[in-house]
Amino acid sequence: MNIFNQLKQDIIVASRQLYNNQEIANTATIEIPKDSFNGDLSSNIAMIIAAKESIAPREVALKFKEVLITLPYIASIEIAGPGFINFTIKADSWQASIKDILQHEEKFFEIDIDKSRNINIEYVSANPTGPMHIGHARGAVYGDVLARILQKVSYSVTKEYYVNDAGSQINDLVSTVLLRYKEALGEQITIPAGLYPGEYLIPLGQILAKEYGNKLLTMNYAERFKIIKSFAVEKMLDLNRKDLADLGIKHDIFFSEQSLHDKGEIEETVKLLERMGLIYEGTLPAPKGKIHEEWDNRVQKLFKSTKYGDSQDRPIEKADGSWSYFASDLAYAKDKIERGANHLIYVLGADHSGYVKRIEAIVKALGKEQVKVDVKICQLVNFVENGVPVKMSKRLGSFASVQDVNHEVGKDIIRFMMLTRQNDKPLDFDLVKVKEQSRENPIFYVQYAHVRTISILSKAKELMPESYNNFESGKYDLSLLSSEEEIEIIKLLASWTKTLEASAKYFEPHRIAFYLINLASKFHSMWNFGKENSDYRFVIESNKELTLARLALASAIQKVIASGLEVIGVEPMNKM
C-alpha cells in the first residue's frame, strides 16, 4: 500500500461523502510535516473546502477527523493551526511499505499522473561553434534528468536540441574555419578578435585542404560559404553530440534554425500572427535613462508581446530587412505545437534570463492559451581548479570543456553534482571535494550506502545461508523493525514515489539528489550505531528473526537508492 496515495484517495472519498465534492479534493496536498511533532502526514483539505463552502476551517477539519479516524492505518489525528489535519500512521502500515518495495517492486515504483500531457523539452541548444563548456553541462544534466523524471511519471516527452545555425556566430565560425583552411594550405594567418582562436578548429581546416586542395579559394563567396558552413556546423554538432553522449545524454531531435528560413516557416508564422492582429508597424520605446547610440527608433514590424505579459513588444525584422532571432523563435514554437506538443519546456542558461517573458508570450499567443509553457533558468557553475577559476570563453580559446571535466571526474560525478543545488541558484563545482571518499562528497556518500547494502546481503548469505534463503522467500517479520531509527528510514523509503512526483510537479530534479543524500545519511547513521551497539547491527547471527527483518530493510534501501540513481542517470556501484 502506498500510504500517500491511499490517504489521498480516502480524503477524496470523505470529501464526496461530507460535502459532495470530489474535484476540489483532488487539489488537496498530502505533505510530510517539517516537525515530527505534527505527526507523519499533513493535509490542507479542510482549508480548501472551507474556502469553497464559506465554513470555518477547523469545523471542516473536525468533520474529516470523525470520518478518517476509522481508517485501519490511522493511529491518531490532530487539528493544528488554521485547520491543518495531521495524521499519525500506525507502525505496521509503514512496515508494510518494505514488503511492497520487495515483493511488488514494479507496482511500487510505477507512477501514472497524466498520459494526456505531451511535453517538448528543449535543453542545451549550445551554438555549434566549439566544444561544450562545463556551464552547458548544468543545463544539459538538468534538462535530461527532468525529462527522465517526467517520463518516469508517465508523461510523453520529446527531448530537443535547437541548433542555432543561422546567426552571426555561425558566420564567425565559417570565417575562422576558412582561415584554418588557408593555414593548412601553408598560408601564415592571424585570427582576428571576435573569431574563434581555439586549436579545435585546426583539424577542420586540414580536412578541407585534403578534400578540396585550393579549390575553395577559386569559388565565389556564396558557394564557398555554403560548403564551409555545412561542413563546420555538422562537425561541431558531432562534437557536441559526443560530449553529450559521454554525459549519458541523447536528444530525440536536433532541430535546425536554418530549416525555418529554408522552408519559409518564418514567413508563414508572421502571416498567421498578422491575421490574428498581433503584428503591427511601430517604434520601440526609448531605453530608460541615457539613450544608447545603438537604439533603433525606426518604424518596424513588431509582435504584440506585451499583450501576453512581456515588458515590451518585440521586433521581428532586423534593420537590413532579414528576420530577427525572435522571429525564428516564433516559427520554432509554432512548429513544436504543430508536431503535437501541448506543454513546452525551455531550459536556458543564466545569460538568457531576460528571455523568459518573451518566450511565454510566444507560446501563449500561438498556443491560444491551450498550450502550457515553462521556462527554467540554470544559473552559473563556479568551476575551480587548484583554486584558480577557469576562463569559460570559446572566443578566448581557454575554457573548461565538458570533455576535460568528464575525463577528470567521470559522467556520474558530473551528473550528480549538477543536481546538488536548485537550478536557479549558482553552483560551486569543487574538483577536490568530488574525489574525496568522505561524507563531504555527496555522490560518494550515496554510492557507499548502496555498496554497503549489497555488502550486508552478501555477508548474510555467507554467514547465515539458511536465513538468507528464508529472506529471499519473503519469510520475515517486519514488525521487528520497531526502533525509532528503523521507522524513520522506513518512512523515508515510503516517501520515494512522493519525492518523484514532487520533482515532476515542480520541475525540480535536485529533490532526487537531496532525497538520496538524506536516505544515505540515515542509513549510515544506523550502520555506525551498530558499531557501538551490537543490537543495531544488520546481521546478528544469534538473532535470526531480527536479521531477516533487517535484511529486508537493507534490500529495500538498496532498491530505492538504485531507483533514484537510475532516474538521474547515474550507475549504482556494487563495490568500491
Curated annotation (Swiss-Prot):
GO cellular component: cytoplasm
Family per similarity comment: Belongs to the class-I aminoacyl-tRNA synthetase family.
Leading EC class: ligase
NCBIfam families with a match to the protein in the record: argS
PROSITE patterns given in the database record: AA_TRNA_LIGASE_I
Enzyme Commission number, as recorded: 6.1.1.19
Name recorded for this polypeptide: Arginine--tRNA ligase
UniProt entry keywords in alphabetical sequence: Aminoacyl-tRNA synthetase, ATP-binding, Cytoplasm, Ligase, Nucleotide-binding, Protein biosynthesis
Organism placement in taxonomy: Bacteria, Pseudomonadati, Pseudomonadota, Alphaproteobacteria, Rickettsiales
GO molecular function: arginine-tRNA ligase activity; ATP binding
Pfam families: Arg_tRNA_synt_N, DALR_1, tRNA-synt_1d
SMART domains named in the record: Arg_tRNA_synt_N, DALR_1
'HIGH' region, short sequence motif: residues: 128-136
GO biological process, one term: arginyl-tRNA aminoacylation
Catalysed conversion reaction: tRNA(Arg) + L-arginine + ATP = L-arginyl-tRNA(Arg) + AMP + diphosphate
Subcellular location: Cytoplasm
Summary of subunit composition and partner proteins: Monomer.
